Amino acid sequence: RKDTLDNRGYIRYTEYEINPLFKGSAAVQEYEIEFYDKADGSEPAKEFILSLDKKMQAKVLRTVALLREEGPFLREPYSKALDDGIFEIRTKFGSDITRVLYFFVVGKKVILTNGFIKKTQKTPASEITLAKQYRADYLARKESSK
C-alpha cells in the first residue's frame, strides 16, 4: 500500500500517523504550513516528500514540524537561508541528504515549494530559481484573487 497525505495533512502509515502539516491554531502562535500548488493542481513539495522512503519522510516531516513551531527562528542544522527570501529545510538520514525549499508570506505562513535529493556540496541554482518562480506565481495568483 502506498502511503499518502490525506485531506487533513496526515501522512498515513500502516503503523502510525505523523501530522506536522495540519492547519489550525494552538496555544502558541505557530506558523501555518502550506504546499505550493501549481496552476494544474500539482504540489511539487508534497509529491517529493511522498516519493521518499518512510524513514526519510519521517525526518523531513519532523523538521517541518520544527519549522511550524519556530518559523524564521529555525536555524542550522535544520534550516538555512539561501537567496532572496528562499530557505531550505535540511534533512540527512544515513548518506541520503534531502532539501525542501520554502518561503514565508505575511500572516505567519510558510509555503513549501519544491524538494530534491542533494548530490553536490552546493544547492543547485536551478532549484533556487524554481522556488523563486513558484513564489512569484503564488504571489501573483494571491494578488489576482483579491
Show the residue positions of the predicted features.
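ATP-dependent carboxylate-activation loops
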Residues: 113
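Basic, Lys/Arg-enriched alpha-helical interface segments
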Residues: 1-97, 106-110, 119-146
